């Protein structure tokens, strides 16, 4: 059985990547695009478990971003998510996540993007992504509730590949 917490983390991680795009678009058409890897050692999960690995690919898509993730959950099962969104706050479908049906993105400033995850219309998490000024890393603060109704507070650290 796949760990719901691990799947949730993977879905949230997808936001992190999309958020990178929001600040990237604000700075330049090419900043923030490409491949990113979760730094599991520097990231913090409450509750866990942390995924064993997670990679995100960011690609421009019209006025927004296409985000795809591939990873290995803490229990060893594989997971992948995908969505394409503009930075207009409108809900769009997320594929592959058991904990998130839709996401929406809003760009706060050149380096900060907020993603809202929903399941059956209910907000499950808010993810705030901040891109480092050097463009080599970003963090994502995740605050919400997991499928069990438990509070979630994660800090994800990503490195550009």
Please report, for each region that a protein language model flagged, where it lies by residue.
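Hydrophobic small-molecule pocket/channel-lining residues, especially in calycin-type beta-barrels
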Residues: 2-3, 25-161
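Bacterial N-terminal signal peptides that target proteins for export
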Residues: 1-12
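Bacterial N-terminal signal peptides
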Residues: 11-20
């Amino acid at each position: 059985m796949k760990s719901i917490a691990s799947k949730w983390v993977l879905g949230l991680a997808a936001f992190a990547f999309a958020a990178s795009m929001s600040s990237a678009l604000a700075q330049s058409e090419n900043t923030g695009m490409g491949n990113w890897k979760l730094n599991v050692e520097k990231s913090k999960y409450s509750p866990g478990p942390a995924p064993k690995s997670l990679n995100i690919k960011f690609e421009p898509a019209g006025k927004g971003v296409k985000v795809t993730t591939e990873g290995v959950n803490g229990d060893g099962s594989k997971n992948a998510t995908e969505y394409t969104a503009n930075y207009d706050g409108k809900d769009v479908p997320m594929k592959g996540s058991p904990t998130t049906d839709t996401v929406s993105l809003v760009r706060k400033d050149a380096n900060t993007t907020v993603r809202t995850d929903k399941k059956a219309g209910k907000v499950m998490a808010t993810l705030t992504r901040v891109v480092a000024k050097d463009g080599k890393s970003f963090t994502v603060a995740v605050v919400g509730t997991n499928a069990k109704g438990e509070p979630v507070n994660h800090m994800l650290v990503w490195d550009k590949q």
